[in-house]
UniProtKB/Swiss-Prot annotation:
Lineage of producing organism: Eukaryota, Rhodophyta, Bangiophyceae, Bangiales, Bangiaceae
Function: Small subunit of the glutamine-dependent carbamoyl phosphate synthetase (CPSase). CPSase catalyzes the formation of carbamoyl phosphate from the ammonia moiety of glutamine, carbonate, and phosphate donated by ATP, constituting the first step of 2 biosynthetic pathways, one leading to arginine and/or urea and the other to pyrimidine nucleotides. The small subunit (glutamine amidotransferase) binds and cleaves glutamine to supply the large subunit with the substrate ammonia.
Region (CPSase): 1-192
Principal location: plastid
Organism: Porphyra purpurea
EC number: 6.3.5.5
Keywords assigned: Amino-acid biosynthesis, Arginine biosynthesis, ATP-binding, Chloroplast, Glutamine amidotransferase, Ligase, Nucleotide-binding, Plastid, Pyrimidine biosynthesis
Substrates-to-products reaction catalysed: hydrogencarbonate + L-glutamine + 2 ATP + H2O = carbamoyl phosphate + L-glutamate + 2 ADP + phosphate + 2 H(+)
HAMAP family per record: CPSase_S_chain
Stored InterPro entries: Anth_synth/Amidotransfase (IPR050472), CarbamoylP_synth_ssu (IPR006274), CarbamoylP_synth_ssu_N (IPR002474), CarbP_synth_ssu_N_sf (IPR036480), Class_I_gatase-like (IPR029062), CPSase_GATase1 (IPR035686), GATASE (IPR017926)
Protein name: Carbamoyl phosphate synthase small chain
Recorded GO CC terms: chloroplast
Length: 384
């Protein structure tokens, strides 16, 4: 039986918030980095996004779960977040697409959550103090004890979390039946020739694969630790470096592989973590943001052009390190003027810090997938 029981959120500095949970039959304590997302919609895509691995996500929008959960809007095959914080979680949801409620979904995967706290106050506190580790508990409500437990968990800086989310095997991806919300693309003529794309899986979202599939690409997904020679043996027309969690500078094997791939002059498109790893391979630097960029309304642009973008990252590429290289800054995050996109001045490499595949979020940057296609077509033409 699901009933409301007391729960507590404790931050590593001792700050705590008392609230409630609907997990009467599960006594759970979880620790992770407490972050916030400002999106009004898309909670299902957010909680299944592998980039949120090891994080407790605070939703700033006050009502979460109103439209339930369905099997079409997931971004991976499991819940990725460590915990969920909300002002209110709807116990009974309503949508013609729903298959279960958010509460049922979280309980099925044993993901702890807390609601009934002042999420506005929590978000403002994280903005002032920066993201930090925290704990959700509905078992032991002693905040001093929980603070000590938090101190035993490492911070995000220096953590390589990719092995927890990458595929263990290489596989070809071809989604036979696209979700109902892909109707426009389902009926669209595939005007592009079959281009072979290798996706290096640092924690790839499904909608990245869907976008490539609807543009006619042959997609092979490979583990993040795949040796360079195995990638090249597939004779790809292009390589996509996916999103993923953790500190990019700790992914030494990924940086090494990309460095070796750069010598082949094959088109490379990096998204989020892939953007950071590509820039690290090109000898740029990354750093941890104070509270990150997580939401679906982040303005990005350059030269009087603005895109509203979906973003989810706690690290960024250092601007000064980019300017010293043969790289061009193609986009800035216009909220804080951090690097949001780069391109190489002489080679077919480009990347963005945000998510052009959206899910959730606007489609302003969707053109980048078609740009990738055009670069690959040119590469194939020159190779022949």
């Amino acid at each position: 039986m699901i009933k409301k029981i007391p729960a507590i959120l404790v931050l590593e500095d001792g700050t705590y918030y008392k609230g409630w949970s609907f997990q009467a039959d599960q006594s759970i304590v979880t620790i992770g980095e407490v972050v916030f997302n400002t999106g009004m919609t898309g909670y299902q895509e957010i909680i299944t996004d592998p980039s949120y691995f090891q994080q407790i996500v605070t939703f700033t929008y006050p009502e979460i779960g109103n439209t339930g959960i369905n099997s079409e809007d997931i971004e991976s095959q499991t819940i990725s977040i460590k915990g969920l914080v909300a002002k209110n979680i709807c116990k009974i949801s309503s949508s013609w697409r729903q298959q279960e409620s958010l509460v049922q979904y979280l309980n099925r995967y044993k993901i702890p959550f807390i609601f009934g706290i002042d999420t506005r106050s929590l978000t403002q506190y994280l903005r002032r103090s920066g993201t930090m580790n925290g704990c959700i508990s509905n078992k032991n409500l002693n905040h001093a004890y929980l603070q000590r437990k938090i101190s035993e968990v490492p911070h995000m800086t220096g953590l390589d979390l990719i092995p927890n989310v990458t595929t263990n095997i290489m596989y070809d991806w071809d989604e036979k039946s696209l979700p109902s919300w892909y109707l426009a693309d389902r009926n669209r003529e595939k005007i592009y020739s079959q281009l072979k794309v290798i996706v290096i899986d640092f924690g790839v979202k499904l909608n990245i694969l869907r976008r490539l599939a609807t543009l006619g690409c042959q997609i092979t997904v490979m583990p993040a630790s795949t040796p360079t020679q195995d990638i090249l043996s597939c004779k790809p027309d292009g390589i996509l470096l996916s999103n993923g969690p953790g500190d990019p500078s700790a992914v030494n094997y990924g940086i090494k592989t990309v460095k070796e791939l750069l010598n082949q002059n094959i088109p490379i498109f990096g998204i989020c973590m892939g953007h950071q790893i590509l820039n690290l391979a090109l000898e740029a630097k990354t750093f941890k943001l104070k509270f990150g960029h997580r939401g679906i309304n982040h303005p990005s642009g350059l030269k009087q052009q603005v895109e509203i973008t979906s973003q989810n990252h706690g690290f960024a590429v250092d601007l000064q390190s980019v300017l010293k290289l043969s790289l061009q800054v193609t986009h800035f995050n216009l909220n804080d003027i951090t690097v949001a996109g780069t391109g190489h001045s002489r080679s077919p490499y480009f990347s963005v810090q945000y998510h052009p595949e959206s899910s959730p979020g606007p489609h302003d940057a969707d053109y980048l997938f078609e740009y990738f296609i055009e670069i690959m077509k040119q590469f194939r033409k020159e190779a022949n």
